[in-house]
Amino acid sequence: MTTMSDLDEIMVAEILCRTPMTCLKTVRSVCKKWNALSKKWFFFGKAKQFLGFMMMDSRVCSLRFDLRKDLVVEPPSIKQVSILDQIEVSKIFHSDGLLLCIIKNDTTRLLVWNPYLEQTRWIQPRHNFHILDCYAIGHDKNRKHKILRFVDDFLPVENVVFGGNTYFFAKERYIFEGKGPEEIDITETEDFLLCFDFTAERFGPRLPLPFHSYYAETVTLSCVKEDQLSVLCQRQPSEPSEILEIWVSTNIQPNAVSWSIFLKVDMRPLTGFQFNDMAGSFFIDQENKVAVVFDLDPSQICRYQTAYIIGQEYGGYFNSVNIGEVPNLWIPGSVGYADTTSCIPPVCSSYVPSLVQIG
């Protein structure tokens, strides 16, 4: 009689590709062979899929997104994370397979979660958190994980983790010194990357971007697996074009970076609107030479989280997939949906499993 352990690797791989990442603990317990294959498949066989996490109604959900070679988009698989069912989360940060969860309406603790091992750990600070606190999680050269906490009283700060260090998109801040905003030329405000080195526990020098962005232009960061950093810039709409660029790092260190262009597309004939860096994120598929941008659609009647698939071939490939309706975050009693800047970013960075024990 054939048992589960007798199935060949191809059949097991097919089962694994249909298994939510948050259910792998059950799969790994079937037998030693399945446990070994699950690690091999996750760490070496997931190049064709995007794995990530998204927020829906203050709940953390896993997201599996397939993009086939013919650019046909499979419906995304979205599963609420059962281990976090009783917790309302306001934001999530990702670092090398670990997720840092900011708890909604709770200033006394944070939660670190390893989805692959299904382990959680509560972190309590010496002093209570503040509503303006920003966070990042990373590790030093000895793989000791640390949490960075700081305050920014202007805008939410976006960051991505690469090589254990955290990279921020930043702009030079002007001090008006009695002058009105109309008297200040902000078109030449310097923008750059900043790296927080978790080994040295300090910020490095300003790192150059491959472009100069202006006010109201969209700039957002992402990682290409564990190997490269990528940055998206969508230019301010101007006749006759609306250019979107994505650059990928060819070399990156805490004190140096170099770039190469990955994608450059005129978005005006494709979408007719500008992505919002406060509401979404993106990842790239280097084999198919496409980018997938997660954002909120531009309608004020009803808002949906949408995945936009963009390519450069054939004059600009474009497709979109509806992920789900966004809850109405507007003031009670008002008509319409909140502006994108009032909404929670829908998708976290792509996920690579970790064997780090935190429980």
Swiss-Prot record:
Chain ranges of the F-box domain: 2-48
Coiled-coil ranges (or none): none
Classification via Pfam families: FBA_1
Name the record gives this protein: F-box protein At1g10895
Species per Swiss-Prot/TrEMBL record: Arabidopsis thaliana (Mouse-ear cress)
Organism phylogeny: Eukaryota, Viridiplantae, Streptophyta, Embryophyta, Tracheophyta
